Amino acid sequence: MSATEPNLQSWIGRSETVHDTIGATPVAALTATLDHPAMPVPIGSALPPLWHWLYFLPMHRQSDIGADGHAKRGGFLPPVPLPRRMWAGSQFEFRAPIRVGDRVARTSTIADVASKDGRTGRLVFVKVRHELRCNDAADPALVELHDIVYREAQRADDVPPPPQQAAGGAAWQRTIVPDDVLLFRYSALTFNGHRIHYDRKYVTEVEGYPGLIVHGPLIATLLLDLLRRNAPEAEVTSFRFKAVRPTFDLHPFRVNGSCDGNSVHLWAQDHEGWLTMDATATLKT
């Protein structure tokens, strides 16, 4: 870190609390986006795991949006002076249901900020802890640890990491076509302005990727949706995922799963069979 850069470590411990009410319309909209038939969403319906991402949307003023479509650096998240930002992974504990109609408070805390040098230059990792409490409860219904990675700009001589072959032996699998409409709908549902998901000229010419990038949270949601399709009565108590390499809109990709007792291995692979996301869910016994 240079003398002119902010002390990013000073952001550790900062917190904010925001409030939302769990409405039915976002649930119905994501149900349609994931290609399920329309169903009533009555008050009291439990949210499927990860669908809390439809709420607590980032309501930044248009004048506060940066060139990449995210909010300008600073504020709650530290002002990391690196241009590329990606969702690296998350861990979850699902302790109690969150239901349609609930009033929910989300307290977010900067848990850690770490910097290191990688193959492609400097990396900064920011870990955020989210706790969601329903209807003024003392204990959280959901705890999430969210890992964000910031990277330097793409260089012409960057060498991509060696790909990792995806596992075989899937008991469940589903092919996903990540077209522009799917990516747009998910961006709209989560009020995500990040241009890498919908602006092809920006993502290819400015950030140097070959195509639009499929949202990491969308892939994670599709993994747990695969579990729900094949084990609809299963109750997920914990989940973790790690983004291994980007998934682009240029080809279909596949989500896979296999169950071993109360542990479910879930993973996504690209059209060449390379692993793009690895995840594990734990089921209530």
Named regions from a protein language model:
Residues 1-103:
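Hydrophobic, proline/glycine-rich low-complexity stretches
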Residues 2-46, 163-219, 226-229:
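A contiguous, surface-exposed recognition patch within enzymatic or periplasmic domains that forms
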Residues 2-15, 87-178, 247-250, 254-285:
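HotDog/MaoC-like acyl-thioester-processing domains
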Residues 10, 17, 21, 52-55, ...:
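Residue-level preference for alpha-helix termini and adjacent loops
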Residues 79, 130, 134, 212-213:
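Alpha-helix boundary/capping detector
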Residues 203-262, 268-280:
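Catalytic-pocket segment enriched in acidic/His residues
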